[in-house]
């Protein structure tokens, strides 16, 4: 590997010449200098960064990792990337005793500079398993899940560096976030080949990843094959069943947990309440909510109240859900108000929807869209349009739906009306064919979801090209008949897509597993595991 050497005195001279009588050059505390650097976020702040950097060298703080990283990041924000690179290369040229590569990578990842961390890694000669673990874990923290898996693959190319438990735990987390079953199985296989002994963290991670990738059967198999002496493993299984709408299984696991004398915690009950909410088990949910404090002395937290509000709202008890919010001993958060807003949309209660919006101090695009949909579904077009105008005035944009799936070892992504895929023409041809076939079997689009008071034909056109429909058309195009289909989506699936996919599952006699922001939907023979309750 070629190393680039930069003269230390040259760096010092460069910094010292930038000194002036500014406030940054008068600071002596490294903490204050760090704050100054973090406050520099635009090209107009370049001079301040140079002065702070000069003061850092003058005071002998030049090799402090936290200040180094802050300086590099500040240069990047101020469009001085060449200075950021020079500084990093200089630091990498120092002796190993001075240059702590792992600390630098960790610090860069913490502030979201994964690109710079990767450059540091490329120029570092003294890499070890910790170095790579910091890269993999950092990518996961920065929501770069595919990069995390690439890092694991690159790590395996070194004969003297072997992945350990931390490597695998982070990689499994990446697979879970992606819903990538192919790579989840690959990581699991690597663990077995490496002879890794499972601990509670890895056991729960395996149960969790298979559940989140849509393979609840394998998740169950793993659960019953490992030592279940830690509550986290039980929680992973209960939560997995909850997201798949398998209430009976989740409740059974809780009973087994009690029989094996494993004490539940607050996460256990959150999983149970979520299960009850997703499956419409109102009375059972109320019982578990009371059981928490009555038998186990676990005081309900904000998320438990949120689950109860969600449970009541989904059951159509929207007014009762609002009354629970009003009686809470804890200040309700935005999640709870959004839950009320969502149930107000489902059960067409614009009055409570407006109350929810008023209590969202920083309402997001999805909140306004929900309120707009409430008005649209009740034919109050003028009110719906006012909400959209308010969004436009406030500069709030609707979050775009995105769907993705793994096929052929690659992640394929789609957005509504997408034409960027290499096989776009074939995808749309398959989709149009499916739309016509489902229509001939009696499917009717749910045009109440479309905002504007336009013709029914135009409304239907707006619904036909949602991201999950394009993803489904692609996988039908590429996969063999009869195989299971797995698709992920970043936001809640609309009722039109939900009903249409039910129709497709019956039409093609295929199982379609769809994971949206709320839960898993297993479509089979024209039915969904959520029982139209999500």
UniProtKB/Swiss-Prot annotation:
Coiled-coil region: none
Disulfide feature: none
Positions of transmembrane segments: none
InterPro entries (alphabetical): DYW_dom (IPR032867), E_motif (IPR046848), Pentatricopeptide_rpt (IPR002885), PPR_At4g14850-like_plant (IPR046960), TPR-like_helical_dom_sf (IPR011990)
Molecular function terms from GO: RNA binding; zinc ion binding
Keywords, sorted A to Z: Repeat
Tagged with keyword Repeat: yes
Region (Type E(+) motif) residue spans: 409-439
Gene Ontology annotations of biological process type: RNA modification
Keyword rRNA-binding part of the UniProt annotation: no
PPR repeats by residue range: 128-158, 164-198, 199-229, 230-264, 265-295, 301-331
Region Type DYW motif, annotated ranges: 440-534
Source superkingdom: Eukaryota
Pfam families: DYW_deaminase, E_motif, PPR, PPR_2
Region named Type E motif: 336-408
Family, similarity comment: Belongs to the PPR family. PCMP-H subfamily.
Designated name of the protein: Pentatricopeptide repeat-containing protein At5g50990
């Amino acid at each position: 590997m070629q190393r680039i050497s930069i003269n230390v005195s040259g760096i010092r001279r460069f910094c010292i010449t930038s000194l002036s009588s500014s406030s940054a050059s008068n600071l002596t505390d490294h903490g204050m200098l760090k704050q100054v650097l973090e406050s520099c976020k635009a090209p107009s702040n370049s001079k301040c960064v140079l002065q702070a950097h000069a003061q850092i060298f003058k005071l002998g703080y030049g090799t402090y990792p936290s200040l180094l990283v802050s300086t590099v990041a500040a240069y990047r924000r101020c469009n001085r990337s060449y200075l950021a690179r020079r500084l990093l290369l200089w630091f990498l040229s120092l002796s190993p005793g001075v240059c702590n590569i792992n600390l630098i990578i960790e610090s860069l990842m913490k502030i979201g500079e994964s690109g710079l961390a990767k450059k540091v890694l490329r120029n570092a000669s003294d890499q070890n398993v910790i170095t790579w673990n910091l890269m993999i874990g950092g990518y996961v923290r920065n929501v770069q899940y595919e990069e995390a898996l690439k890092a694991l693959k690159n790590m395996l190319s070194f004969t003297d560096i072997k992945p350990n438990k931390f490597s695998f735990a982070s990689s499994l987390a990446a697979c879970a976030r992606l819903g990538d079953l192919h790579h989840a199985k690959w990581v699991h296989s690597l663990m077995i080949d490496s002879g890794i002994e499972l601990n509670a963290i890895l056991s729960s991670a395996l149960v969790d990843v298979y559940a989140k990738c849509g393979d609840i059967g394998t998740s169950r198999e793993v659960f019953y094959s490992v030592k279940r002496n830690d509550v986290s493993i039980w929680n992973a299984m209960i939560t997995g069943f909850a997201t798949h709408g398998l209430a009976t299984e989740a409740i059974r696991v809780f009973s087994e947990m009690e029989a094996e004398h494993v004490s539940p915690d607050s996460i256990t009950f959150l999983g149970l309440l979520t299960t009850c909410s997703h499956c419409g088990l109102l009375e059972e949910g109320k019982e578990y909510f009371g059981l928490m404090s009555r038998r186990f002395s676990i005081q309900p937290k904000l998320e438990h109240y949120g689950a109860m509000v969600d449970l009541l709202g989904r059951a159509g008890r929207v007014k009762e859900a609002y009354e629970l919010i009003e009686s809470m001993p804890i200040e309700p958060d935005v999640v709870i108000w959004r839950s009320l807003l969502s149930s107000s949309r489902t059960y067409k209660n614009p009055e409570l929807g407006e109350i929810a919006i008023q209590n969202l101090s920083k309402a997001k695009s999805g909140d306004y869209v929900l309120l707009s949909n409430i008005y649209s579904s009740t034919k109050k077009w003028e009110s719906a349009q006012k909400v959209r105008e308010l969004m436009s005035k406030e500069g709030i944009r609707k979050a775009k739906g995105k769907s993705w799936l793994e096929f052929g070892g690659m992640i394929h992504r789609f957005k509504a009306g997408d034409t960027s895929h290499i096989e776009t023409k074939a995808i749309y041809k398959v989709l149009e064919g499916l739309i016509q076939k489902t229509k001939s079997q009696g499917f009717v689009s749910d045009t109440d979801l479309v905002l504007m008071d336009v013709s029914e034909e135009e409304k239907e056109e707006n619904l036909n090209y949602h991201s999950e429909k394009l993803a489904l058309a692609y996988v039908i195009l590429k996969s063999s008949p009869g195989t299971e289909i797995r698709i992920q989506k970043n936001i809640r699936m609309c009722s039109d897509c939900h009903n249409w996919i039910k129709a497709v599952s019956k039409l093609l006699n295929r199982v379609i597993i769809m994971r949206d922001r709320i839960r898993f939907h297993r479509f089979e023979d024209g039915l969904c595991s959520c029982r139209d309750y999500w």
